Amino acid sequence: MGVSGSKGQKLFVSVLQRLLSERGLHVKESSAIEFYQFLIKVSPWFPEEGGLNLQDWKRVGREMKKYAAEHGTDSIPKQAYPIWLQLREILTEQSDLVLLSAEAKSVTEEELEEGLTGLLSASSQEKTYGTRGTAYAEIDTEVDKLSEHIYDEPYEEKEKADKNEEKDHVRKVKKIVQRKENSEHKRKEKDQKAFLATDWNNDDLSPEDWDDLEEQAAHYHDDDELILPVKRKVDKKKPLALRRKPLPPVGFAGAMAEAREKGDLTFTFPVVFMGESDDDDTPVWEPLPLKTLKELQSAVRTMGPSAPYTLQVVDMVASQWLTPSDWHQTARATLSPGDYVLWRTEYEEKSKETVQKTAGKRKGKVSLDMLLGTGQFLSPSSQIKLSKDVLKDVTTNAVLAWRAIPPPGVKKTVLAGLKQGNEESYETFISRLEEAVYRMMPRGEGSDILIKQLAWENANSLCQDLIRPMRKTGTMQDYIRACLDASPAVVQGMAYAAAMRGQKYSTFVKQTYGGGKGGQGSEGPVCFSCGKTGHIKRDCKEEKGSKRAPPGLCPRCKKGYHWKSECKSKFDKDGNPLPPLETNAENSKNLVKGQSPSPTQKGDKGKDSGLNPEAPPFTIHDLPRGTPGSAGLDLSSQKDLILSLEDGVSLVPTLVKGTLPEGTTGLIIGRSSNYKKGLEVLPGVIDSDFQGEIKVMVKAAKNAVIIHKGERIAQLLLLPYLKLPNPIIKEERGSEGFGSTSHVHWVQEISDSRPMLHISLNGRRFLGLLDTGADKTCIAGRDWPANWPIHQTESSLQGLGMACGVARSSQPLRWQHEDKSGIIHPFVIPTLPFTLWGRDIMKEIKVRLMTDSPDDSQDL
């Protein structure tokens, strides 16, 4: 029945008493409770899984019989068998005699029906005059015997004895019917012969006839149940079975039917519209399938209220047209108390929005009481009168409120905390984002705009770099396509390719992945005036009055037309020596206006990929300050560089030379803005007697980083220091500075007798040495394809010798050997006679160093 506990007991007792009372049987409440407790003891599955149907009830009977055989008949309550038989008769809509005859396997259903029909026909025709005939008395006797057999001991006798006894009773019934039919036939033949032998012309009767006539007349009015003789037809036909009045519904459905007749509509859900058109709003009430509610509760308990399967079950429930009261009962029964409060709050908000949207749009006004089931629509009987349009709004708001319930553990700031992980693919992140957004609002233009905005803001830094060029013009498909292969290796390769083509990283990404209507390569020409794409210089609409006027006569040397800050003269026009140029204040002003302090720092980015040999070195006095109150002097890169995580620490040249002011020492620190972009500057100390070029130690903190020529990367702080009489190792520092960094070592000599191995790089076979002990793979210059891009590095190789002018591949290469493969960034050395396979490949292909002693063998 689906209900257990005290509530299930009360429901079963009330239904049992009502069903038996309709048959004229009264069962005490104590007897009904005793039977229910015995039923739970015999069939514990019935309260939860069973129902009042013939199949389950027969199963209960079999288990009662088994229980009696094991524990004895005394263990069964006195009223158990009568109650069980009465309910079985109700469920099958048959009499006790038919039930008993149907259980006899040797008697077919057709024979049983024919025998019963003849029995009833013979008994009805036996009534002639006076009292009831002897046939009725004999039939009643047999029926009483059969009834006693049914109610007294239906299961105590053995199966074989039961069948034999049932056969005997059926044979007796047939004999009674046949005997009465033969007697009736003989009597009619005798009356017909006497009628034909009568002389109708002679009115005189014999004395015996007159005596017989007077005797019959004396008893003419003795019996009130006078039945006139009916002439039987020659062709005997089987009488039609009487149509019985259908029994009322049983079980929980019957209880609800009785409640509807009395006006109690508490359980009248869902409201089903049976009309063929939308205009037919005649409601019919059906119980919501119990299995559906169980499935919904199980899904909420095991997977959560916001799981996709749970939402699918909610949509199935929503197809049943529930009223506001029904939705509240369903949510309260399946959700946790906290989630129910969230659902109710969201449902009320959605209902208020619906009332505001539908105001003045419909003929029938929709009120908040209709949607919430409050006020005059508080009772379920008033809610069933709601129109179909109102019930649609109720269902829509209820489903949206359910979808707004957050997953377990995420109660607030769902969208703000939905970030893409560093190793998470972009398409997986978009899937989680769409699920969260659609749980809060329906699909539409508003949800698409929100998803696109969050797809950019909540993406990781790598995907943001890929999306940034197409953020405003691209679609979600462009975003996903741009981040399809997002990985640090891909970004590094794209940065190398952009540097080789002399383009900005953002421009290269936009041209590679598209990002708008024109697709790849649709940016158009670049304006040389404003730097924007889509037009040329002569069509530029930017203001042209902001150009800087040409310089006049230099006020410092008075020998040429150039700016004072760019004056390099050491003598004026009269030959007098000039003092050092005071550039701090001047450069500060120029920096505010956007003017670079030196020719090198104002050079065009990307045009010069190396050092400018014609530019003289700068001194400490030439370095600018960001603002008048800046504590540090800005150090700028004088070379375009691309840094990756595998490059480690690199040295960036600044072309700044000369000794520091007396009594000071220098401290190099980074800039916070560069660190946010992924560039990490290692602090360094510049001695007061250092006369060489100041270089900055940098490395990539997160992903590949591009440093443009003239870009400010670090600051130089001039600090006073205290001299102590400590021992001095060297008299002067001179120009000696940093040593070699990012070394790649090999420790064995190279000869032709070494073992060689063929490995494919991007589909091209290379032959190289195995036992060199190199940490990184080094490709010989003669083996490197000319069309594969490379770039120079600041690293050098050390081993038995020294290799300078080392280059590196500008793109990641995929190597493959048999079933093994991977990604490497090899070095390219022009002077190397052989290609050297490093540990970055050998450890992946499981190369082992073997000796005669197994203990000394190890994997690379």
From Swiss-Prot:
Catalytic reaction list: dUTP + H2O = dUMP + diphosphate + H(+)
EC number: 3.6.1.23, 3.4.23.-
Site residues (Cleavage), renumbered to this chain: 99-100, 195-196, 228-229, 254-255, 269-270, 496-497, 745-746
Cystines in this chain: none
Ranges of residues in domain Peptidase A2: 766-841
The keyword Methyltransferase is annotated on this UniProt entry: no
First-level EC class: hydrolase
Biased composition (Basic and acidic residues): 154-169, 178-193
Superkingdom in the source lineage: Viruses
Motif PTAP/PSAP motif, residue range(s) on this chain: 305-308
GO terms classed as biological process: proteolysis; viral translational frameshifting
Pfam families: dUTPase (PF00692), Gag_p10 (PF02337), Gag_p24 (PF00607), Gag_p24_C (PF19317), RVP (PF00077), zf-CCHC (PF00098), zf-CCHC_5 (PF14787)
Record text on cofactor binding: Magnesium ions are required for NC-dUTPase activity.
Keyword tags: Aspartyl protease, Capsid protein, DNA-binding, Hydrolase, Lipoprotein, Magnesium, Metal-binding, Myristate, Phosphoprotein, Protease, Repeat, Viral matrix protein, Viral nucleoprotein, Virion, Zinc, Zinc-finger
Location of the region described as Disordered in the Swiss-Prot/TrEMBL record: 154-193, 572-631
Residue ranges, compositional bias (Polar residues): 584-601
InterPro entries from the UniProt entry: Aspartic_peptidase_AS, B_retro_matrix, B_retro_matrix_sf, dUTPase-like, dUTPase-like_sf, dUTPase_trimeric, Gag_p24_C, Peptidase_A2_cat
PROSITE patterns, alphabetized: ASP_PROT_RETROV (PS50175), ASP_PROTEASE (PS00141), ZF_CCHC (PS50158)
Full protein name: Gag-Pro polyprotein
Organism: Mouse mammary tumor virus (strain C3H) (MMTV)
